[in-house]
Amino acid sequence: MNGILISLEGPDGAGKTTVLKEILPEIQKMKREIVPTREPGGVRVAEEIRQIILDPKNTDIDSKTELMLFAAARRLHMQEKMLPALQAGKVVIVDRFIDSSVAYQGYGRDLGVEVVDWLNYFATDGLKPDLTLYFDVDTDVALERIMKNRADEVNRLDLERAEMHRKVREGYLEIVVKEPERFVKIDASQPLEKVVADTLSVLKKRFVSEF
């Protein structure tokens, strides 16, 4: 497998999804084909699981069920879309991957990092990104952005208490420290143009031979 896997991570409201849309025209200049995708989702059945997970009406989904739904969607997505692209030598850039489960379910839901790490490994056969861009923003700022920018489409996780969102951010910050060779932290509190510029700078430095 000689493709490149890049993941984008961060708390809800960090703006990584918007950044991905903004950088796509530039990174599509890379020598390899770019495959942008997202989790949960990316393929038909995984997108259906996404709807179940994020539907605000599904308040009866407990933490363990939530974790396993994410893992099921991840397995489908990896098998059907990510692996074939990587095996074909393409660049897969995914909006959320294994670290989201560690941050949200391991830390945010208090299920424990070891449990989530094991399930991630089981679901992905140990697949890890070559590079993970972590978009960091203060929790209060992130929640304010959510209510301002997507008040009409908040999902079940957006509606969680601020304390859970704080635990998620703290979890991400611990994960970043544990794997400094894989993670690059980007200050997502900056204006969008600066965040986009910083993101492109990291990608061009890390994969200089690919541009």
Swiss-Prot record:
**Keywords (A to Z) from UniProt:** ATP-binding, Kinase, Nucleotide biosynthesis, Nucleotide-binding, Transferase
- Identify the stretch annotated as signal peptide in this record: none
This entry's Gene Ontology molecular function terms read: ATP binding; dTMP kinase activity
Q: What is its EC number?
A: 2.7.4.9
Tell me the residue numbers annotated for binding ATP: G10, P11, D12, G13, A14, G15, K16, T17
Q: Which PROSITE patterns match?
A: THYMIDYLATE_KINASE (PS01331)
Task: Identify the InterPro entries for this entry.
Answer: P-loop_NTPase, Thymidylate_kin-like_dom, Thymidylate_kin_CS, Thymidylate_kinase
Q: Which reaction does it catalyse?
A: dTMP + ATP = dTDP + ADP
Q: Which GO terms describe its cellular component?
A: cytosol
List residues traversing the bilayer: none
Q: What does the entry give for GO biological process?
A: dTDP biosynthetic process; dTTP biosynthetic process; dUDP biosynthetic process
Database matches in SUPFAM superfamilies: P-loop containing nucleoside triphosphate hydrolases
- Spell out the family assignment given in the record's similarity comment: Belongs to the thymidylate kinase family.
Note the PANTHER family from the entry: THYMIDYLATE KINASE, UMP-CMP KINASE 2, MITOCHONDRIAL
State the function annotated in the UniProt record.
Phosphorylation of dTMP to form dTDP in both de novo and salvage pathways of dTTP synthesis.
Entry's NCBIfam families? DTMP_kinase
Q: Quote the protein name from its UniProt record.
A: Thymidylate kinase
* Source organism per UniProt: Lactococcus lactis subsp. lactis (strain IL1403) (Streptococcus lactis)
Gene from which this protein is expressed: tmk
